[in-house]
Amino acid sequence: MSINNKEIANRVTGQVIKFIQTANDTNGELLEMESLYPLFSKEPPVHYHPHQEEYFKVLKGELTVRIGNEARVYRSGSTIQIKPGVKHSMWNEGLMDALVNWKVYPAMDTEHFLTTLTQLANTGKTNDAGVPPLPILVFLLKKYNQTFRLAKIPMGILSLMFILFNPLFKAHDYKKKFNQPLRYFLAGKNNL
């Protein structure tokens, strides 16, 4: 299920994402979005995508991008390419909202991942940085490990944490809860 031409708005981080082309629309080849980063947004955790390449074009405002240990400001008209496996983060330190065209190749399940995080934030299940509690974070990092990985958590440690939390995941039926986030999001259900 895709939600192209629909928007998701994260009430915690202020980020708004409009899905333009989804995995469904492109046979999995591409996910294209427009993302609004509000002014004075916080830097998210440094992360990487093991199998995906990202392209960003700043349409309005400016975007601060950290690649490795270097942070650089990109202004309107700038383009950014991030190869698979490159550790990065991006946010808006500017004085106005930033609007960015964002393409992800291949799409994989990025749409579901972003929708799940937004729904968790909008239902009060994250901290003020938009990060869910440790058990949910571990479950999602394992579920989406081909799409998104945090730079500070090695896969071996994540796998061990997943094993330790597994009884909790089963007791709370995380597999079912986090299986179809788009369906729950579109139905307006807040039960993630």
Regions found by a protein language model. Give the residues of each.
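Basic/polar N-terminal segments that are highly enriched at the extreme N-terminus
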Residues: M1-K6, N190-L192
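Short acidic-glycine-tyrosine-enriched beta hairpin
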Residues: A9, Y55, G68-K87
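A short glycine-rich, His/Asp/Glu-containing loop-to-beta-strand
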Residues: N10-V46, Q52
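Tight coil/turn sites that cap or link beta-strands
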Residues: L39-S41, S76-G77, G85, L95
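Glycine- and acidic-residue-biased ligand/ion/polar-headgroup-sensing regions
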Residues: H51-L63
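Ligand-binding loop in jelly-roll beta-barrel domains
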Residues: P84-F113
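Alpha-helical membrane-targeting segments
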Residues: T110, T118-L192
